Amino acid sequence: MSLASLPEFAALRSHADGVRIPPDASVPLTPRVRALVDSALVRRLARVSQLGLVSLVYPGAVHSRLEHSLGVYRLAVEFLVRLEGDARFATLVGTEDASAFLAAALLHDVGHWAYCHPLEDMGLPELPRHESLLRGLLLDGEAAGILARDSLHAGVPYGRHFDQDRLLASLCLDERGEALAITEKGRTAAELLVFARYVMFSEVYWHHAVRAATAMLQRAVWIVRPAIDPALLMRSDDASFADWLTRTAAGTPAAPLAAGLFGPTRRLFKRAASFDALHHPEVHRAIAGRSYADTAAISARLAERLSARLATPVDPHTLLVDAPPAEREVEFRLQVRERPARHAMGATHRWHRLEDVSPVVRSLAHEQFDDLVKRVRIFADPVPAAAIASCEGLEDIILEAVAG
């Protein structure tokens, strides 16, 4: 039985039974897909926001993990439609495999609990992981769907300027037939996708105020970590998590942090200092990529030194050193298939990594993102933040705190 017999193919073409999601996509819902979408496991994702704390800075960014999952599933159907005519793919993938792939695309986030990405970045053994089976098999096609939707809801244009249709049309199998790749015709579209991710990280996902909120959430959870119940977290949605953290933080130094994020009044900490790898290599190298336990200890020592230097006392619980995750976020592992020269009789396709044939990707993912966007930042309550920002010799004080 060929892939063309999949009911989702016909549903995609007919638009007869589906649901609409932004920007302007019709998601095909066959009876078997609808049964999954209507299950309690998937419906919980309607109560988990896709961008979490980003909505504190971009108020429109309140779309859900359910909307995102529907978009990834639709993209997976489009992948299969494109690859149906690939002889190698048709040999390797039958209808059962394809059906499992579609189910995995729809269900890839069912393990997502509220605010799990910033909390998983802490690397705490108390916190569960939400990883899902087929995430790596989607060619970062998930990213293609994410960017346009996140950009639309955030009210910014940055994630919508790449040619998704061209990227889909260039899909093929990689050299070993084990993963998705693109033909050389899709290289520019892939470069634009990487650029869109770069700008979205720079201006939205890692906006300095979003990082402030993230640092506040991480410190609050760090303070109350003895009370963490992994099973409860795995079932949480945004509202239940906020309620749990607010109640658990009551009477602890985490209380003002939780209140600033989830209370009736929004109160985000202010940026006291920022250090990128290009202009402040020593401080950046000393802190970036450290464990959360290390940055918490550095924060405490730094607060002690700053309190001795400044007229304003600095609370060690509310001085936050934000070290971005070590993993690179904007490039993706992808092979590009280059066709042989027309005069080369008997020659086969040549294969290259995208970053090896694209100076754009190399520059964005390495020089630009690692050196300029992945900044180490110091956040604090507004009053001490202003004093810290004007503190003379701050870099030396920070390096002393790092050294212990």
Functional labels for PLM-detected ranges:
Residues 1-100, 112-404:
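Histidine-centered, transition-metal-coordinating active-site segments
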Residues 99-107:
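Short alpha-helix carrying the canonical HExxH Zn2+-binding catalytic motif
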